[in-house]
């Protein structure tokens, strides 16, 4: 077993860092700060951060095959041109729910951009329940709605053979799986593959490794956990020096490093003194397993 090292690589005290995505071409980590309405790009070589401000809470960002990025901003699927910082609306959802916003999102192996919604929080994880839905933006910019009655739409990823879709609705305290039909993007046969332990707290962002195991960031749990979705067993726990771990992705050399985002919103002054790195970006090395490259939106 290699020795695990946890390093704080970016000290910017983001309010709610989320949706980390590694861009291999630029050796950059993309992520968002949701309440600050900011998309960030950290250059791992120069250690510089670039930012683009948008007009509403931005909850996820993803790569785009034709260049630039896509992002979920408010209740809009958007294209983001990094060079001139312009934002172009591709589609809108939940137009009848003025209090909703998107949350986590990710691109599937066929280039569709999946993302779900939730009601705006009055405090972290405090909100009107069952207001959200799960959607995907197809390459032709059409939108498919999969289901509603979602509390906090969160982590998502696909099995290595693309036949299973993994999904987290945070307040269910479970990681769920669906049968996945890649050609059509249809999902079916929902079941639970992992139930959170009490001390693991709230399941948030998620990613998959080359062995098909899932990594879940535990909000208020201060850790990422590695799960076997076939057995429902937890295989590994990596604790971080902050409680509000929000999401994780693999990146860096051969996708052998894990990047973890976290939040500081909702913490007391005393809590912030105790955890000065709250809201920063962490890199974990020595996990002994690699991740896979993120998919890019095909539209």
Curated annotation (Swiss-Prot):
Optimum pH is 6.4. It catalyses: D-glucono-1,5-lactone + H2O = D-gluconate + H(+). A divalent metal cation binds at residues 18, 154, 204. Signal peptide: none annotated. The modification N6-succinyllysine is found at residues 144, 244, 253. The keyword Hydrolase applies. Substrate binds at residues 101, 103, 121. Belongs to the SMP-30/CGR1 family. This is Regucalcin. It comes from Rattus norvegicus. The gene is Rgn.
């Amino acid at each position: 077993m290699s020795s695990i090292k946890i390093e704080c690589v970016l000290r910017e005290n983001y309010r709610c860092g989320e949706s980390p995505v590694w861009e291999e071409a630029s050796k950059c980590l993309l992520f968002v700060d949701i309440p600050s309405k900011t998309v960030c790009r950290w250059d791992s070589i120069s250690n510089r951060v670039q930012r683009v401000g948008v007009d509403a809470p931005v909850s996820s960002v993803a790569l785009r095959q034709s260049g630039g990025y896509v992002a979920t901003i408010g209740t809009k699927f958007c294209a983001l041109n990094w060079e001139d910082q312009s934002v172009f609306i591709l589609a809108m959802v939940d137009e009848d729910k003025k209090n909703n916003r998107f949350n986590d999102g990710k691109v599937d192996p066929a280039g569709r951009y999946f993302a779900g919604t939730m009601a705006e929080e009055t405090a972290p994880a405090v909100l009107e329940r069952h207001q959200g839905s799960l959607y995907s933006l197809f390459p032709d910019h059409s939108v498919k709605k999969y289901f509603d009655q979602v509390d906090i739409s969160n982590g998502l990823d696909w099995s290595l053979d693309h036949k299973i879709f993994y999904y987290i609705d945070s307040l269910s305290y479970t990681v769920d799986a669906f049968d996945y039909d890649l050609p059509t993007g249809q999902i079916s046969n929902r079941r639970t593959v992992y139930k959170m332990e009490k001390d693991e707290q709230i399941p948030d962002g998620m990613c998959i490794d080359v062995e098909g195991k899932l990594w879940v960031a535990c909000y208020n749990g201060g850790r990422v956990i590695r799960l076997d979705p076939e057995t429902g067993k937890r295989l590994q726990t990596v604790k971080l020096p902050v409680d509000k771990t929000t999401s994780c992705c693999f990146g860096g050399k051969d996708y052998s490093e894990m990047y973890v985002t976290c939040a500081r919103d909702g913490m007391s002054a005393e809590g912030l003194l105790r955890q000065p790195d709250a809201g920063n970006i962490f890199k974990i090395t020595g996990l002994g397993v690699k991740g896979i490259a993120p998919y890019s939106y095909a539209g």
